[in-house]
Each structure stands twice: as structure tokens, then as C-alpha cells.
Amino acid sequence: RLFGVRCIVTCGSDAKVAAALDLGAAAAINYRTADFAAEVRKLTGGRGADVILDMVGGDYLPRNLSCLSDDGRHVSIATHRGVTAELNLLEVMRRRLVLTGSTLRPRSLEF
């Protein structure tokens, strides 16, 4: 919030939703009881999220991309649901999406 970022999070339980809101999330969605992609679209007035930090991977990738704004950035940092996903590359190109990732491990200065 300090930088003007509105953080929308997804959680697997109502208790985690409450905790995320207590920690300062602008909105929290229980992905077990709601269609998180539709909720993100609704919360952003149909625009979608500018950045998605994905710790799930696998079959969640297409759903994450569906709630990403045009020119949005998807950042993968874990693969709890698997390391492979099917996606429509034409959609990625048409909407000018950026897909990137990190293992969050340190690198040498020479890298």
C-alpha cells in the first residue's frame, strides 16, 4: 500500500482470508468456494491484475492468465500443482503478457 499497490490475494480457507485481510490485503478470495479469476475481474472493474505472483503453477497458470490485465506480468516462484501447464500462446501475444519466474535462490556476482 505504501507504493499505491492494491493487493488481492487468494487463500484456501476462510481463516486464511481473514488473516490476509488483517495483514493489509485489499481483498482476499477463498479459491475453494469462489471462482477467483471472476472475482479478480470484478474487483478490478474488468481490467484484471497488473501483476500475478504465482506460487501454485500447473493447472492454475491458465486461470491466472485469464485474470491478468492486458500488458500484465505473471511471475512464477513455485510449482506446487506441477511444473507443466497448457496455455494459448496466441492469447499471450495478443494481450502482450509477460511471463517470467524465479527460484528465489541467490546468484553469484559473476552471474
What does each model-found stretch correspond to?
Residues 2-63:
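Adenosine-nucleotide cofactor-binding segment
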Residues 3, 11, 20, 59-111:
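Glycine-rich phosphate-binding loop and adjacent beta-alpha segment
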